[in-house]
C-alpha cells in the first residue's frame, strides 16, 4: 500500500519540516523500539486472563462451563476493533490515533482492575480487546515512518515486540497475580500503558496516511461523507471476491480455535490435583511460545523458497499430532510442555505462511487484507475459548483435547481439499 505524507511533508522531510522523520528519512532511533514495546504491551493485555481463569471464575462466581467467556469477549472485542478501528489508521493522524487509543486502553484496563462485579468485568474486558488493536496501527505507523530500504527491519522489530508480548503475557500475569493479587495485573498494566501513551505523544511526529481504495488519497471522515464506511466495506469486498483470502482466513479460524482451546482450558487441570500449580507456574507454560518465534523464521524462509503450500501442510500435520502428548497432561507435565511446543510451532508456521500468501494477492491493499484476516484469527480464538470451557464442563480434559484435535484435523482436511484446486490457493 502506497504511503504519502499528509500536510506539509515532502521529499525534504516529514511533517515537522526539513530533516524531520518521514518516508524519505529514518525516524529517530528511539521511535521504533518504543513502538515495539508499546505493541508488545498492548497485545499482552489480551492474554493476561488466561492463567487467571480459575481465580476469576471463583472471585466472580462464574459457572465453570462459562468461564471461557472471559477470553471469548476479549477476543470478540479484538475482532471488532480490527474491522472498525484499524482502518482509521489510513484516514486519521496516526499520532493522535495511537496515543488516544492507548489512553483509552489504559482506562479499560483500570476498569478491569477495579471491576466490582462480573458484568463490569466482562464489559471492561471486551473494551480491552477492542482497544488492543492499536498494536496493528503501530505496525503501520512504523512502516510509514521508515524509508523503503529500511522498512523491513522496522516492521520486523515492531512485530517482534508483538511476539514477545504474547510470549511473556501469561508468565507476567501469573507472577503478578501471585505476588499482589489478580487486580494488580491490570492496574500495573493500566499505569504502564498510560506512560507509553505519553512517551509516544512526545516521540511521534504527525505521521502519514495511506491511499484509499482504488489508489486515490484517503478522505477524512466528514470530508465527503461516508468514506470511513466505504473503507470498512472495501475490506469485506476483498474477501468476498478472492477465494484464497477466504480459505486462508478459515484456516486461521480453525488453527487459532485449536490454540485457544489449549491455552484457555489448560488452567483448570494445572490448578487441580494432582498438580495444584500456582498462577506463576501456570503462566510459565506460556513460555513454550518461544517455539513460535523460531517457527516464524523457519516458515518465512520456506515461503521465500516457494514452499508455502508444503509449509502449511507440515504445520497442520504437526498441529494434529501435538494433541497426543497434550492429552497426557493429567499424567505428565513434560508431555504437556512437549505438546505445547509442537502446537505453538505449528500455529506460528501456518500463521506466517497465511500472511505471506494473502498479502501477495493484493499488495496495494495489504493493510485491509491483514486486518480482515485477523478478524478470522480473533473469531477462532473466541470460539476455542468458549468451546474449551463447555468441553471441560461436559467431559473434563479428555473432551478438551478431543475438541482441540477436531479443530486441528478440520484445518488439515481443508488444506488437503485445496490441493485439487486450480489455480493453486497458496
What label would you give each PLM region?
Residues 156-202:
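Helix-loop-helix hairpin linking two adjacent transmembrane segments in secondary transporters
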Residues 80-118:
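Conserved MFS/SLC helix-loop-helix module at the cytosolic interface between two early adjacent transmembrane helices
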Residues 125-162:
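Cytoplasmic helix-loop-helix junction between adjacent transmembrane helices
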Residues 309-354:
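C-terminal transmembrane helical hairpin of 12-TM major facilitator-type secondary transporters
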Residues 17-26, 205-249:
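Juxtamembrane intracellular "pre-TM" segments in multi-pass secondary transporters
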Residues 81-93, 295-308, 392:
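Helix-to-loop junctions at the C-terminal end of transmembrane segments
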Residues 190-212, 414-418:
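C-terminal membrane-cytosol helix-exit motif in multi-pass small-molecule transporters
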Amino acid at each position: 500500500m502506497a504511503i504519502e505524507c499528509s500536510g506539509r511533508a515532502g521529499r525534504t522531510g516529514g511533517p515537522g519540516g526539513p530533516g524531520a522523520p518521514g518516508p524519505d528519512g529514518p525516524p529517530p532511533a528511539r521511535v521504533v523500539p518504543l513502538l515495539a514495546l508499546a505493541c508488545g504491551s498492548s497485545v499482552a493485555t489480551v492474554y493476561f486472563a488466561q492463567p487467571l481463569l480459575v481465580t476469576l471464575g471463583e472471585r466472580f462466581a462464574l459457572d465453570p462451563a462459562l468461564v471461557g467467556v472471559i477470553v471469548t469477549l476479549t477476543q470478540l472485542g479484538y475482532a471488532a476493533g480490527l474491522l472498525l478501528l484499524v482502518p482509521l489508521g489510513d484516514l486519521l493522524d496516526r499520532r493522535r490515533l495511537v496515543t488516544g487509543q492507548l489512553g483509552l486502553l489504559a482506562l479499560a484496563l483500570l476498569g478491569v482492575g477495579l471491576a466490582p462485579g462480573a458484568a463490569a468485568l466482562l464489559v471492561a474486558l471486551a473494551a480491552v480487546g477492542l482497544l488492543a488493536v492499536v498494536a496493528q496501527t503501530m505496525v503501520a505507523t512504523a512502516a510509514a515512518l521508515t524509508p523503503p530500504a529500511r522498512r523491513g527491519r522496522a516492521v520486523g522489530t515492531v512485530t517482534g515486540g508483538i511476539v514477545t508480548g504474547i510470549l511473556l503475557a501469561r508468565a507476567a500475569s501469573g507472577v503478578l497475580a501471585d505476588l499482589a493479587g489478580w487486580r494488580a495485573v491490570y492496574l500495573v498494566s493500566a499505569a504502564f500503558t498510560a506512560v507509553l501513551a505519553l512517551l509516544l505523544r512526545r516521540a511521534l511526529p504527525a505521521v502519514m496516511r495511506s491511499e484509499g481504495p482504488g489508489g486515490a488519497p484517503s478522505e477524512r471522515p466528514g470530508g465527503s461523507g461516508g468514506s470511513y464506511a466505504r473503507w470498512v466495506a472495501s475490506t469485506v469486498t476483498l474477501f468476498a471476491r478472492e477465494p484464497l483470502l477466504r480459505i486462508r482466513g478459515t484456516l486461521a479460524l480453525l488453527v487459532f480455535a485449536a490454540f485457544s482451546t489449549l491455552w484457555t482450558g489448560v488452567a483448570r487441570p494445572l490448578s487441580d490435583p494432582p498438580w495444584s500449580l500456582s498462577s506463576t507456574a501456570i503462566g510459565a507454560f506460556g513460555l513454550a511460545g518461544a517455539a513460535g518465534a523460531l517457527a516464524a523464521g523457519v516458515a518465512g524462509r520456506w515461503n521465500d523458497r516457494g514452499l508455502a503450500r508444503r509449509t502449511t501442510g507440515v504445520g497442520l500435520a504437526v498441529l494434529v499430532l501435538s494433541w497426543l502428548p497434550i492429552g497426557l497432561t493429567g499424567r505428565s507435565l513434560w508431555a504437556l510442555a512437549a505438546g505445547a511446543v509442537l502446537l505453538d510451532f505449528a500455529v506460528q508456521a501456518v500463521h506466517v505462511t497465511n500472511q505471506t500468501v494473502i498479502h501477495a494477492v493484493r499488495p496495494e491493499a495489504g493493510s485491509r487484507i491483514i486486518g480482515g484476516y485477523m478478524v478470522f484469527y480473533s473469531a477462532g480464538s473466541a470460539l476455542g475459548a468458549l468451546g474449551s470451557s463447555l468441553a471441560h464442563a461436559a467431559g473434563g480434559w479428555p473432551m478438551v483435547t478431543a475438541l482441540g484435535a477436531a479443530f486441528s484435523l478440520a484445518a488439515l482436511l481443508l488444506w488437503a481439499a485445496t490441493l485439487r484446486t486450480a489455480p493453486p490457493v497458496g
